[in-house]
């Protein structure tokens, strides 16, 4: 049977070959001989055109039966709306029942509060409350729109002017939410193809801004200027031929995750040597560092013009809400058109802008608050200097006092559980509210976890001694026995 098929195929092939090679299959058109294979190719072209112009075949539609619908529904397994709850997520933080001042109320009990960044003790300040009340009576609660439409009110412009005057910069811009300031400002200036060199210890808001920028991100070791220099050197070597490459250094003045203070003078020297721009977040230094609270530039005696972009949240030292960015007029004007947090968000409620103006006035008129804050930081450092099982790793002038475990278990999760147990006992046994440096799974910071204490000018000497004694007792009971 197979041999018969082969013979039939060969016979058909010979017949086609004979037809195509016969003299009758050759045509002369305008002096050009047309052979048989041209005929076949033309025929194929016609077939292709017919196939392309035909309507596609659509199988007849048949609605599913009730039984088929039920079977599909039974087989469907929906994805969970949220990720599964892990053991470390079950820890419930304490809930404040009053304002987050130096003392607050938790579970109906008065506690000493070292968990709020109320550095100057302005939460509940009489002048700020009066300012908020008068602004509410004049403007109402909200601004009812973004700044570029109908959300700009005179108090917003007054606040921007007051910030610029306080810091000695040409212009400023307000944001309605402190955290959004950094993750709107960074993508505003940094785009795909740019290079950003960032400290590995920056907080989550900055990390989010770096991700949204879609730039090439390179991290250097936390607060290590030699690591920064080597990183900048490598980038300049790698992109030597890229003439229009935009390059940025991103850092915090006081690092929220460690309490370290950035050496701005050295950063500026490296910036000028390698021709980078600097974006600096002063959320934890504005109103705190420097002789008059003007931040890291004053602290290191560096002209503020050396910093290209300065941002800060106003929810810390100023005891209000929102954030700002300050710098030269071109930097600020560009954000008014291109920064998503400014363009698309409702503007800062007027009463909060009014409170910020009043807070800056209070700082200007009461330099003794800064002196008191520095004294409190020094007193807490002295009290915790001999704590067993933990070590102080923050800067001595930082308002964030950071206690790190001397002996880690090797697992950040286990270390965190131990620190949370310590914080829970401090609250229950000594009415002391402190926090561990808990981070979400989205946070890329890999610095060691620890206990953070936010020092306030409103803390009394007895508050600081109470914190020192409580933590030393708990450290000896929990850490030395484990």
From Swiss-Prot:
Predominant subcellular localization, coarse grouping: endoplasmic reticulum
Tissue expression pattern: Ubiquitous.
GO cellular component, one term: endoplasmic reticulum
GO annotation, biological process: embryo development ending in seed dormancy; multidimensional cell growth; regulation of programmed cell death; sphingolipid biosynthetic process
Cleavable signal peptide: none
Named cofactor requirement(s): pyridoxal 5'-phosphate
EC number: 2.3.1.50
Annotated Pfam families: Aminotran_1_2
Reactions catalysed: L-serine + hexadecanoyl-CoA + H(+) = 3-oxosphinganine + CO2 + CoA
UniProt keyword annotations, A-Z: Acyltransferase, Apoptosis, Endoplasmic reticulum, Lipid metabolism, Membrane, Pyridoxal phosphate, Sphingolipid metabolism, Transferase, Transmembrane, Transmembrane helix
Membrane topology: Single-pass membrane protein
UniProt keyword annotation of Transferase present: yes
Compartments it resides in: Endoplasmic reticulum membrane
Consequence of gene loss (knockout): Defective Embryo and pollen lethality. RNAi mutants display plant size reduction, altered leaf morphology and increases in relative amounts of saturated sphingolipid long-chain bases.
InterPro entries, per the entry: Aminotransferase_I/II_large, AON_synthase_class-II, PyrdxlP-dep_Trfase, PyrdxlP-dep_Trfase_major, PyrdxlP-dep_Trfase_small
One MF term in the entry's GO annotations: serine C-palmitoyltransferase activity
Keyword Cytoplasm: no
Pathway: Lipid metabolism; sphingolipid metabolism
Class of the enzyme per the UniProt entry, highest EC level: transferase
Note: The fbr11-1 mutant is incapable of initiating programmed cell death (PCD) after induction by fumonisin B1 (FB1), a specific inhibitor of ceramide synthase.
Function as written in the Swiss-Prot or TrEMBL entry: Component of serine palmitoyltransferase (SPT), which catalyzes the committed step in the synthesis of sphingolipids, the condensation of serine with palmitoyl CoA to form the long chain base 3-ketosphinganine. The heterodimer formed with LCB2 constitutes the catalytic core. Involved in the regulation of the programmed cell death (PCD) signaling pathway. Plays an important role during male gametogenesis and embryogenesis.
Subunit structure: Heterodimer with LCB2 (LCB2a or LCB2b). Component of the serine palmitoyltransferase (SPT) complex, composed of LCB1 and LCB2 (LCB2a or LCB2b).
Name this protein carries in UniProt: Long chain base biosynthesis protein 1
Protein species of origin: Arabidopsis thaliana (Mouse-ear cress)
């Amino acid at each position: 049977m197979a041999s018969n098929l082969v013979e039939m195929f060969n016979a058909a092939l010979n017949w086609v070959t004979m037809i195509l090679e016969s003299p009758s299959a050759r045509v002369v058109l305008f002096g050009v001989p047309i052979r048989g294979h041209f005929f076949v190719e033309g025929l194929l072209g016609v077939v292709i055109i017919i196939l392309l112009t035909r309507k596609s075949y659509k199988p007849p539609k048949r609605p599913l039966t009730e039984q088929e619908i039920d079977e599909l529904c039974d087989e469907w397994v929906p994805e969970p709306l949220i990720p599964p709850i892990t053991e470390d997520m079950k820890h419930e933080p304490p809930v404040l029942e009053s304002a987050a001042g130096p003392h607050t109320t938790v579970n109906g009990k008065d506690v000493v509060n070292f968990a709020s960044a109320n550095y100057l003790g302005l939460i509940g300040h009489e002048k700020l409350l009066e300012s908020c009340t008068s602004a509410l009576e004049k403007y109402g609660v909200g601004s009812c729109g973004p700044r570029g439409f109908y959300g700009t009110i005179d108090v917003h412009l007054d606040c921007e002017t007051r910030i610029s005057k306080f810091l000695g910069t040409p212009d400023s811009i307000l944001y309605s939410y402190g955290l959004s300031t950094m993750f709107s400002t960074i993508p505003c200036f940094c785009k795909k193809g740019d290079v950003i060199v960032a400290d590995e210890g920056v907080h989550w808001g900055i990390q989010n801004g770096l991700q949204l920028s879609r730039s090439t991100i390179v991290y250097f070791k936390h607060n290590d200027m030699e690591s920064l220099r080597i990183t900048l050197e490598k980038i300049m070597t790698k992109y030597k031929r890229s003439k229009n490459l935009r390059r940025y250094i991103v850092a915090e003045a006081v690092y929220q995750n460690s309490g370290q203070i950035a050496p701005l003078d050295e950063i500026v020297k490296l910036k000028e040597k390698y021709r980078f721009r600097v974006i600096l977040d002063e959320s934890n230094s504005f109103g705190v560092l420097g002789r008059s609270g003007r931040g890291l530039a004053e602290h290191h005696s560096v002209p503020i013009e050396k910093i290209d972009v300065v941002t800060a949240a106003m929810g810390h030292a100023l005891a209000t809400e929102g954030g700002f960015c300050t710098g030269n007029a071109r930097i600020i004007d560009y954000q008014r058109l291109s920064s998503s947090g400014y363009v698309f968000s409702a503007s800062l409620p007027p009463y909060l802008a009014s409170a910020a103006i009043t807070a800056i006035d209070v700082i200007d008129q009461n330099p003794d608050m800064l002196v008191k804050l520095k004294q409190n930081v020094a007193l807490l450092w002295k009290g915790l200097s001999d704590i067993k099982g933990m070590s102080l790793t923050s800067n001595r002038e930082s308002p964030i006092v950071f206690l790190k475990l001397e002996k880690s278990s090797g697992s950040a999760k286990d270390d965190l559980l131990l620190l949370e147990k310590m914080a829970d006992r401090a609250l229950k046994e000594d009415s002391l509210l402190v926090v561990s440096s808990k981070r979400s799974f989205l946070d890329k910071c890999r610095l060691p976890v620890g206990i953070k204490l936010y020092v306030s000018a409103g803390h009394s000497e007895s508050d600081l001694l109470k914190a020192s004694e409580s933590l030393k007792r708990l450290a000896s009971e929990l850490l030395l026995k484990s």
